[in-house]
Amino acid sequence: MKLAMRRASTFALLALSWSAAVSAASSAGDYFVRSLPGAPPGPLVKMHAGHIEVSPEKNGNLFFWHFQNKHIANRQRTVIWLNGGPGCSSEDGALMEVGPYRLKDDHTLVPNEGSWHEFANLMFVDNPVGTGFSYVNTDSYVTELDEMADQFVIFLEKFFELFPEYSQDDIYIAGESFAGQHIPYIAKHILDRNKNSMTKIKWNLKGLLIGNGWIAPNEQYRAYLDFSYSKGLLDKNSETAKTLEAQHKDCAKEWEDNGPKVDVAKCESVLQTLLKLSSKVEADGKRHCVNMYDVRLRDTYPSCGMNWPPDLVNVTPYLRRKDVVEALHVNPNKATGWTECTGAVGQSFKAQKSKPSIDLLPKILEEVPILLFSGAEDLICNHIGTEAFIGKMTWNGGKGFEVTPGTWAPRRDWTFEGKDAGFWQEARNLTYVLFKDSSHMVPFDFPRRSRDMLDRFMGVDISSIGGNPTDSRLDGEKLPETTVGGAAGNSTSKQEEEKKKLDEAKWYAYRKSGEVVLVIVAVAAVAWGWYVWRDRRRRRGYQGIFGGSPSESTTRLPGLGSRISSTPSGLEGFRSKRQNGRDVEAGDFDESELDDLHTQTPTDARYSVGADSDDEEDASGSRKEGGPSGGRGR
């Protein structure tokens, strides 16, 4: 009995050590991107990428791609970027909008001169689970906004555990389109978390930026028609207009009968009908319609913008390359390649029990500044709808952009490097920026202008680091200097000191991860040695008393002369694990390689990412034309 208890305690200790080793395998070093296929010559932007588990019971993991800032201006900042959909990958933002690189073709990256990582760490997250490189069991897609926000906070908790050097940064959450629902909900959950007395480390949420956001559905649904009239897409006296106005009345009635919703089916059909009835057969014999993301452009019906932007033809094949997937630490058992927008996620995420995010904005504005920006040529989440809900909303003691009763904050004309860029308007913690001649994806059209906007909103001060400031003016008045396009200097002692602190924190995190694994390995080795010693001693004792031989139910371990159970254990998996062809248990590795340990979990081979949405794409990875409602979404 005592022998059995000793064996049980021994294997329990070994199992505990193995379990700890598995959990410790995810360290900052595991996420480090050592090289990126197609990257331009010169130093690679420091980056990390991979999955973080947010719902173990549903096998839900969020994928992130993090880029370290180029320069530190007066304080550390982190910008988190989310695309919309719902179900559209934030790698759109990484490779077509605000990330450090753009694709010249499907295998060549070039620098993005307007990248948002100039003065801020920049992280893209495929959100919610099932989107892009993120994954979850196919029957467990997120359906409500609070559930999404809960998972995102879990993601941030684990991210900051892995990278504690970023946990006290000023945090900004940015994105576009349907992220106008995600971002306010995430912000609310962060603010609630910070108010919890049990929270040890508060996160410094400093601002939200939402571009062409789907925030106030009621105003946006009505704006489909108002925007079309203003742009000459629709004749107010036409039969088409009468049909659409009747549809909108049905939409308004459903809204009134059922209360505010994020998504109303009868209202969604207004845009689809508008695109269909305004389409025409043109000289090439094909039916063409307006591009709903940029009304200056045309597209074949029923795509109506889903073939845009042009960079998309390079992004999809690039993110499906085996070497790129490996470089970004995407799970190799992924059942499908990267998809820009996962239809199954969008179909599940109806948020029928969630209030539209506009209901959250007034309370958030009491604590956090918000910047809303719009591209003037976007139809699907157009600026008329955004301006309408701002005008109706009451926050911080006033309605709309009132500065005094009856007096509104002026729209200040914005010029960028001598060109008309749009206007700015702000009051009581809310800023609104209209980008002239821009589409649904503002940073795609104007990356440098968009970063100028970001830097001003964050209060970037380049006086300590130098650099060439851009000429950006409001009503002719030159604004505080920020650099756009030119590299900032890095010459002051203050800058070097801040960088040194950051590096020290980072390497401390890496060392800590390595030390934990070494301790676990040492404990396991001692426990195993003790067990072997006790087993040999006991076996010798049995032979001396009985003259017998070891039991047939056990096997001899070659080279040790000891016995182990013939039933495989967790230790067996650890013992056979090899790194670069070398035996990990034998110690044939250096300390830095501990960061590269990865253990396959039981779930590795059984998850699927949007497997039921693969029918949206053809063999080349391009989206099939399934009508306006079956494509990118918002």
Curated annotation (Swiss-Prot):
Subcellular location: Golgi apparatus, trans-Golgi network membrane
Cited InterPro entries: AB_hydrolase_fold (IPR029058), Peptidase_S10 (IPR001563)
Gene3D superfamilies: alpha/beta hydrolase (3.40.50.1820)
GO process terms (BP): apoptotic process; proteolysis
Signal sequence coordinates: 1-24
Active site feature: 177, 378, 440
PANTHER family named in the record: PHEROMONE-PROCESSING CARBOXYPEPTIDASE KEX1 (PTHR11802:SF190), SERINE PROTEASE FAMILY S10 SERINE CARBOXYPEPTIDASE (PTHR11802)
GO molecular function, one term: serine-type carboxypeptidase activity
Topology class, membrane: Single-pass type I membrane protein
Protein name (Swiss-Prot/TrEMBL): Pheromone-processing carboxypeptidase KEX1
Keywords attached to this entry: Apoptosis, Carboxypeptidase, Glycoprotein, Golgi apparatus, Hydrolase, Membrane, Protease, Signal, Transmembrane, Transmembrane helix
Glycosylation site residues: 429, 490
Functional summary from the UniProt entry: Protease with a carboxypeptidase B-like function involved in the C-terminal processing of the lysine and arginine residues from protein precursors. Promotes cell fusion and is involved in the programmed cell death.
Sequence similarity: Belongs to the peptidase S10 family.
Record-listed E.C. numbers: 3.4.16.6
Glycoprotein recorded as keyword: yes
All ranges on the Lumenal side of the membrane: 25-512
Reaction it catalyzes: Preferential release of a C-terminal arginine or lysine residue
GO CC list: membrane; trans-Golgi network
Transmembrane intervals: 513-533
Disulphide bond pairs: none
Any Pfam family the entry gives: Peptidase_S10
Residues covered by region (Disordered): 468-498, 542-634
Cytoplasmic side: 534-634
